[in-house]
Amino acid sequence: QAKVEMLDNLLDIEVAYSLLKGGAEDNKKDPIDINYEKLKTKIEVVDKTTKEAEIILQYVKNTHAATHNTYTLVVEEIFKIVREGEYQKYRPFQDLPNRQLLWHGSRATNYAGILSQGLRIAPPEAPVTGYMFGK
């Protein structure tokens, strides 16, 4: 199990490294801007006074289990993520009424891959640590 977890971590690091490495770069651009563009993702901060933010904050409050009483949750920022090409995939379903907010926690090494390639279903051999609601 430990070896599978190590391989999973290495794969996440490889994805992040491949994004950072990239190809020929424009030396006039800021490296942060170059790497942000490689994600092919638009990231916006959501104003906490909006209805969208209020719903998310209420969900956080409602899903903080009574068994997790040794800490309190504080939402520091809320981000809206728009991945390139995702809207076209979503468009045929946008008028359906059955929507759900889903929570996803992940290691920092996973975020470059999640943002650039989307969230993928964990393979059966992946470690189960941290799955509060199952896989």
Curated annotation (Swiss-Prot):
Subunit: Homodimer; PARP-type zinc-fingers from separate parp1 molecules form a dimer module that specifically recognizes DNA strand breaks.
Organism: Oncorhynchus masou (Cherry salmon)
Regulation of its activity: ADP-ribosyltransferase activity is regulated via an allosteric activation mechanism. In absence of activation signal, parp1 is autoinhibited by the PARP alpha-helical domain (also named HD region), which prevents effective NAD(+)-binding. Activity is highly stimulated by signals, such as DNA strand breaks. Binding to damaged DNA unfolds the PARP alpha-helical domain, relieving autoinhibition.
Locations listed in the record: Chromosome; Nucleus; Nucleus, Nucleolus; Cytoplasm, Cytosol
GO molecular function: damaged DNA binding; NAD+ poly-ADP-ribosyltransferase activity; NAD+-protein mono-ADP-ribosyltransferase activity; NAD+-protein-aspartate ADP-ribosyltransferase activity; NAD+-protein-glutamate ADP-ribosyltransferase activity; NAD+-protein-histidine ADP-ribosyltransferase activity; NAD+-protein-serine ADP-ribosyltransferase activity; NAD+-protein-tyrosine ADP-ribosyltransferase activity
Residue numbers annotated as active site: K135
Protein role: Poly-ADP-ribosyltransferase that mediates poly-ADP-ribosylation of proteins and plays a key role in DNA repair. Mediates glutamate, aspartate, serine, histidine or tyrosine ADP-ribosylation of proteins: the ADP-D-ribosyl group of NAD(+) is transferred to the acceptor carboxyl group of target residues and further ADP-ribosyl groups are transferred to the 2'-position of the terminal adenosine moiety, building up a polymer with an average chain length of 20-30 units. Serine ADP-ribosylation of proteins constitutes the primary form of ADP-ribosylation of proteins in response to DNA damage.
GO BP terms in the entry: ATP generation from poly-ADP-D-ribose; DNA ADP-ribosylation; double-strand break repair; innate immune response; negative regulation of innate immune response; negative regulation of transcription by RNA polymerase II; positive regulation of double-strand break repair via homologous recombination; protein auto-ADP-ribosylation
Family: Belongs to the ARTD/PARP family.
Top-rank taxon, per record: Eukaryota
Residues annotated as domain PARP catalytic: 30-135
Catalyzed reactions per annotation: NAD(+) + (ADP-D-ribosyl)n-acceptor = nicotinamide + (ADP-D-ribosyl)n+1-acceptor + H(+); L-seryl-[protein] + NAD(+) = O-(ADP-D-ribosyl)-L-seryl-[protein] + nicotinamide + H(+); L-aspartyl-[protein] + NAD(+) = 4-O-(ADP-D-ribosyl)-L-aspartyl-[protein] + nicotinamide; L-glutamyl-[protein] + NAD(+) = 5-O-(ADP-D-ribosyl)-L-glutamyl-[protein] + nicotinamide
Domain PARP alpha-helical: start-end pairs: 1-21
A Pfam family this chain is assigned to: PARP
Chief place of localization: nucleus
Leading EC class: transferase
Residues that coordinate or bind NAD(+): H104, G105, S106, G113, R120
Entry PTM: Poly-ADP-ribosylated on serine, glutamate and aspartate residues by autocatalysis. Auto-ADP-ribosylation on serine takes place following interaction with HPF1. Auto poly-ADP-ribosylation on serine residues promotes its dissociation from chromatin.
Keyword Calcium: no
Keywords recorded for this protein, A-Z: ADP-ribosylation, Allosteric enzyme, Chromosome, Cytoplasm, DNA damage, DNA repair, DNA-binding, Glycosyltransferase, Immunity, Innate immunity, Isopeptide bond, NAD, Nucleotidyltransferase, Nucleus, Repeat, Transcription, Transcription regulation, Transferase
Keyword Transferase applies: yes
Protein name: Poly [ADP-ribose] polymerase 1
